[in-house]
Amino acid sequence: MAPKAKKEAPAPPKVEAKAKALKAKKAVLKGVHSHKKKKIRTSPTFRRPKTLRLRRQPKYPRKSAPRRNKLDHYAIIKFPLTTESAMKKIEDNNTLVFIVDVKANKHQIKQAVKKLYDIDVAKVNTLIRPDGEKKAYVRLAPDYDALDVANKIGII
């Protein structure tokens, strides 16, 4: 049985060769160049087509180390305010008053108070004083008492 299989194998390349030859003959007669229509341009300005722009793949990073975050939790909150009006806020409104970094925003102040004093913050109001410092009114969550927290951190 094996010799018959060997005899059948050479036949297909002959058929393929014949088909290839016919295809070549047809191409010679007809011509391989297709007749592409020329695009009619309606504008005098030529807009260059958008080409593929590959992303940069640098051989080495341009910065040796990432920049250190200078505005960490300890830098954001400078000190608590202990004025009479601040004490009134602690007693009446469940609010602590801090002097904070001018560049800090409300979210950063909230996170800093949460981390440093382990308390939940309801909301933060800020203002910039005439002397250029930023004051933050930190309203505590209802389940925390501002008077207890003030005692713990040493305001009172």
Curated annotation (Swiss-Prot):
The modification Phosphoserine is found at residue 43. It is found in: Cytoplasm; Nucleus. The keyword Cell inner membrane does not apply. Residues 20-67 have a biased composition (Basic residues). The modification N6-acetyllysine is found at residue 70. The modification N,N,N-trimethylalanine is found at residue 2. One of its GO terms (biological process) is translation. InterPro entries: Nucleotide-bd_a/b_plait_sf, Ribosomal_uL23, Ribosomal_uL23-like, Ribosomal_uL23/eL15/eS24_sf, Ribosomal_uL23_CS, Ribosomal_uL23_N. Pfam families: Ribosomal_L23, Ribosomal_L23eN. N-terminus is methylated by METTL11A/NTM1. The modification Citrulline is found at residue 41. Residues 1-19 have a biased composition (Basic and acidic residues). The modification Phosphothreonine is found at residue 45. GO terms for cellular component: cytosolic ribosome; nucleus; ribosomal subunit. Belongs to the universal ribosomal protein uL23 family. Component of the large ribosomal subunit. The ribosome is a large ribonucleoprotein complex responsible for the synthesis of proteins in the cell. Binds a specific region on the 26S rRNA. May promote p53/TP53 degradation possibly through the stimulation of MDM2-mediated TP53 polyubiquitination. HAMAP family: Ribosomal_uL23_A. The N-terminal beta-like import receptor binding (BIB) domain mediates interaction with IPO5, IPO7, KPNB1 and TNPO1. This is Large ribosomal subunit protein uL23. It comes from Oryctolagus cuniculus. The gene is RPL23A.
